Design a protein with these regions (language model features):
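Cofactor-/ligand-binding subdomain signature composed of acidic, glycine-rich
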Residues: 1-81, 232, 286-321
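Divalent metal-coordination and catalytic microenvironments
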Residues: 37, 90-92, 144, 170, ...
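Gly-rich Lys/Arg/Thr-decorated short loops/hinges at beta-loop-alpha junctions or inter-strand turns
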Residues: 48-59, 83, 108-117, 187-189, ...
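N-terminal small/polar loop signature for handling phosphorylated ligands or for N-terminal nucleophile
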Residues: 66-179, 184-185, 335, 339, ...
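Acidic, two-metal ion nucleic-acid-processing modules in DNA metabolism proteins
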Residues: 107, 112, 136, 246-343, ...
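Functional cores that coordinate and move charged inorganic groups
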Residues: 137-140, 148, 153-296, 300-309, ...
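Flexible, glycine/threonine-enriched loop-and-boundary segments that flank and lead into catalytic domains
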Residues: 346-372
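Short glycine-cluster motifs
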Residues: 384-399
Length: 581
């Protein structure tokens, strides 16, 4: 694949030395680690204790969320009266885990509960008229939507006309008007003063469950087994790993590693992961894509069936199907990505200025979001990938750091049939005759708003570090910064003037990666294992014994039951290329 332009390394300003010294002394840690804590807003011993020891006692009161009282009361009325409940969610990981979580909880109290996942190709994203018709046919009196519904004004009206109440649980940005549902739970509502507004869709569903349990005497500890579903949502939907999300993810990972639900146990087995050592990265790169593949290639209903399965044998059968879908998805993804790259390189795309817009009516709608991400990796500019589905042009958009692509799409709302999403990722649908004007206006808007420096990927370096500092104790404390994610990334370090110890080799299909044992000149016996993905173009320079600089994160590598410290190199510069940082 074509590589994005060279990254700019930006070394963050060190924290106040007095604060660093004080915190390092109080907590008994290395100054580098104290500096990292202060950069995360942790400046006192008490704050450090809370950071290193997340507690479920620190979760916010769910009744601080607007409409929670009425939502809980309406759900309880349905449960005790034997009214049929339909749990409705999006087909992606966040939606299917949310549906699995709420469905699993509600079925503890009633068997009058069903779930519905819209078909990506037939119905598209969000609440559909077909889904409401399903609720009518199945006799449901209450629909609870998860990870969707905040814009479903007409669908809520239609449901009401059929005698069906709706509770909306969403985390997307609402428009000026809200649906006239019984309750609208969304921490991003302007009139909602919930203290944390970056919950995932599944997170909003969990707050409903938490509130229901508190109101009606369900012990909180019985909710802990649901947290493995929630951490999969938090990691896969890339919400911030701070505040309440970090607490929930911490205990969700614990549940996932110690006693996962049968569906996630099947995913762990099929992903060839080390039981008991599943990380956020494993969710993002192994488990999440497999669950997503169900909705991309077949039906998201399969994912919920997997995640609510009560027997491992059944879960493994469903998991095998999903695994096959994921393999098919990867093949199609590769083919379409190459076709899209060819279109860009031959100038055969709708737009390739400040933005990139490519369109092929034959592409599989289920993978266009992935392809958009690949193009951003390759060219580092806001990208829209479009195909044709059900007579409309539809697709996905992905942005670069610092640029609000959702705002650009919103500026073309008059040309669109539907759109939704976040600042950095969105989906849209439009009529084919509007495509040229959409491309023109998107490019015009983005050209006017984007800043030149945004077009160069930036690697933020937290601190310079000598290899001598990377001791078992240092790494043991660093691990307690987990779980990592947006807002609490795995720290990035810079070490200058390093060498390969002589054992470096190319690895991976086609030899595009490198496995190196690194040393610094003044510490030739202190070797550290490292992995550099897609950087084999530097291999000759390194094998000739030349020095280079690296920025990297420190990770724990598990292999055949053994663990070791490994550097995951994010970028590498040959010494003659260094112009200072």
């Amino acid at each position: 694949m074509v590589q994005a332009r060279d990254s700019k390394w930006v070394l963050r300003e060190p924290s106040d030395p007095e604060k660093v010294d004080r915190l390092a002394t109080e907590v008994g840690i290395d100054k580098v680690l104290a500096d990292l804590l202060i950069k995360r807003g942790v400046e006192t011993f008490a704050q450090a204790r809370s950071f290193f020891r997340p507690s479920l006692d620190n979760l916010h009161d769910p009744f601080l969320m607007k409409d929670m009282d009425v939502a809980v009361e309406r759900l309880h009325r349905a449960v005790v009266s034997g009214e049929s409940i339909l749990v409705y969610g999006d087909y992606d990981v966040d939606g299917t885990t949310a549906v699995a979580l709420l469905y699993s909880f509600v079925r503890r109290f009633t068997d009058k509960v069903d779930f519905y996942i819209p078909d990506r190709y037939d119905e598209g994203y969000g609440v559909s008229f077909k889904g409401i018709d399903y609720a009518v046919e199945s006799g449901a009196g209450l629909i609870v939507t998860l990870d969707c519904g905040i814009k479903a004004i007409d669908k809520v009206e239609y449901a009401a006309s059929k005698g069906i109440d709706m509770i909306i649980c969403d985390h997307h940005l609402p428009e000026d008007s809200l649906p006239a549902a019984v309750a609208v739970l969304d921490p991003k509502r302007e009139d909602c003063h919930y203290p944390f507004d970056d919950l995932s869709g599944c997170g909003v569903g969990f707050k409903l469950v938490q509130a229901y349990s508190a109101r009606y005497g369900v012990p909180f500890e019985t909710l802990v087994p649901l947290l493995d579903l929630l951490v999969v949502s938090i990691a896969s939907d890339l919400v911030s790993m701070v505040g309440e999300n970090r607490i929930l993810a911490h205990f969700g990972l614990k549940q996932l590693n110690e006693n996962p639900c049968t569906g996630l146990q099947a995913m762990i087995n099929l992903s060839s992961l080390e039981p008991g050592h599943v990380s956020i990265d494993d969710i993002v790169f192994k488990i999440g894509p497999r669950i997503n593949a169900a909705g991309r290639m077949e039906t998201g209903r399969l994912a919920v069936e997997l995640l609510t399965s009560r027997s491992l044998s059944e879960a493994m059968q469903i998991g095998e199907k999903i695994n096959e879908s994921n393999n098919e998805r990867k093949n199609i993804d590769r083919e379409i990505t190459q076709e899209a790259l060819d279109m860009v390189q031959t100038g055969n795309c709708l737009c390739n200025g400040s933005a990139m817009i490519v369109y092929n009516p034959e592409w599989n709608k289920g993978v266009v979001g992935i392809v958009a991400s690949r193009l951003v990796e390759a060219y580092y500019k806001p990208t829209v990938v479009l195909t044709k589905s059900n007579g409309f042009v539809s697709g996905s958009a992905r942005s670069i750091s610092g640029f609000d692509l959702y705002g650009a799409i919103e500026s073309c709302a008059d040309l669109l049939e539907n759109f939704g999403g976040h600042v950095y990722a969105a989906g849209l649908t439009l009529r084919e005759e509007n495509l040229p004007e959409f491309a023109r206006r998107m490019d015009e808007y983005i050209s006017a708003k984007i800043e030149t420096e945004m077009m160069t990927p930036v690697i933020e370096v937290d601190s310079k570090l000598n290899f001598a500092c990377i001791t078992p104790k240092f790494f043991r404390i660093l691990k307690q910064f987990q779980p990592f994610g947006p807002g609490n990334h795995n720290p990035v370090f810079l070490t200058e003037n390093v060498y390969d110890a002589g054992t470096g080799r190319k690895v991976g299909a086609g030899g595009v990666h490198m496995k190196l044992d690194l040393i610094q000149e003044d510490q030739p016996y202190h070797q550290i294992s490292s992995i550099a993905f897609n950087m084999a173009e530097h291999y000759d320079h390194i094998k000739e014994g030349n020095p280079f600089d690296i920025c990297y994160s420190i990770v724990e590598n598990y292999y055949r039951g053994n663990s070791s410290i490994q550097l995951r190199i994010k970028d590498l510069r040959e010494r003659e290329d260094i112009c200072g940082i």
